[in-house]
């Protein structure tokens, strides 16, 4: 992103909960991917879900013998149950859903493009523009509004599932606006929005205080960035009783900004969920994040954005570019040469480095695809080498 040149400018990010209709679809897509990978590590999967009312339609293309034995309906039901949709009054009920399986086979043309006969190499599963980003605003190297927006909803989910706040229901969204100084450092939370589905028999007056005092404030680590001027918009539309797929149709891949950096970085448009690692929309996005995070952690810059571009069937990226964080062209070229010579950016190289044949994807797809330190692409194991070669 461009540098902020004036003080008192604000930046905003949003997040959605696991019970948001689009996120239900993402989770079903990734749960299906995981179940296939448990048996077939080399499966090719592109799974798309649409969910509306009490209907789930599962489509896409899968190339794996596991498809024949996969219990699609049970996978979908388990996800919906685990989220907390156990009563149709919530907007969905796992016990009564209708599931339509419309999954087809992967195109033979695509199969041939990805895997050439007589070669172990993998070409990219599609063309695409991919970005990876990191900044030094938080300990997870993510933008502060984005991290806080997700943390608020995770806290709400924990309190809902534990029964600590009984009137909460699964569907929710948040949005955080933070004021920055002229050096682009976060200095104050200006506004927090939380829209949370709730039981019909509770008033908005009784909803407001628990959301602020039990969910929002305990989530904010740095108390100095909130004050009496911080405003809270809690269910600004009024009642939020009708939620889940009864209120809105959900679709896989429709929350790509909430999945990545909350609007702080560019996005090539490709979604993550339901895709195996030959799809560079997902795997190369993880790799670009890994590189960017290690660059910022090494002190190369306060923020770093990397663009990768691929062509279907071709191993190596056709373009690599630093798109934010480095202003010196000569230094940028030195960094690019380092990236090319030290990181394998082919699909095979990325899959091996980041261990992407494992059934890990359901864990990635809620509350941000990035910033979860359990995953390989969040490791800071390249920092020392970067500092040795590149640190000015």
Curated annotation (Swiss-Prot):
It catalyses: L-methionine + ATP + H2O = S-adenosyl-L-methionine + phosphate + diphosphate. The keyword Transferase applies. K(+) binds at residue 48. InterPro entries: ADOMET_SYNTHASE_CS, S-AdoMet_synt_C, S-AdoMet_synt_central, S-AdoMet_synt_N, S-AdoMet_synthetase, S-AdoMet_synthetase_sfam. Coiled coil: none annotated. Binds 2 divalent ions per subunit. Mg(2+) binds at residue 22. GO terms for biological process: one-carbon metabolic process; S-adenosylmethionine biosynthetic process. ATP binds at residues 20, 171-173, 248, 254-255, 271, 275. It is an enzyme of class 2 (transferase). L-methionine binds at residues 61, 106, 248, 279. GO terms for cellular component: cytoplasm. Homotetramer; dimer of dimers. This is S-adenosylmethionine synthase. It comes from Borrelia garinii subsp. bavariensis (strain ATCC BAA-2496 / DSM 23469 / PBi).
